[in-house]
Amino acid sequence: MMTAVAIASLSVFGMPTTASAAELAGSWSGNGSIRLPSGDRENARCNVTYSRSTGSSYTAFAVCATKSARVSQSAKLQRVGGNAYEGSFYNSEYNVSGSMSVTVSGSSQVVSLDGGGAQASFRLSKR
């Protein structure tokens, strides 16, 4: 369960870099790594769908899995400049929340998460 909580606290999103803001919307998938509160690391795979809410605000829904757990979470992001986005995520199953940043560069993005005593980083590609 500790792995599931860590995934829940970390598996969703990151910071964008060189695509237009409109290019954040859509489906993305990729791999990354989670550092658990115990200090252990696990590889994870995530599928994320971003939707524009208003202007420069987005919502996201992600499903991420490691060899030991699978979790779903939601997020809210705000464009903070260029192709950089920041926001927060929440996993209702484990009641875990945290901060996240996304940087988009063309058809790829880097996502960083911090919450629930764990950190994660993912590289996602547009599907």
What are these regions (language model features)?
Residues 1-6:
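Bacterial N-terminal signal peptides that target proteins for export
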Residues 9-18:
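C-terminal segment of classical bacterial N-terminal signal peptides
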Residues 22-127:
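Central antiparallel beta-sheet cores of small beta-barrel/beta-sandwich binding domains
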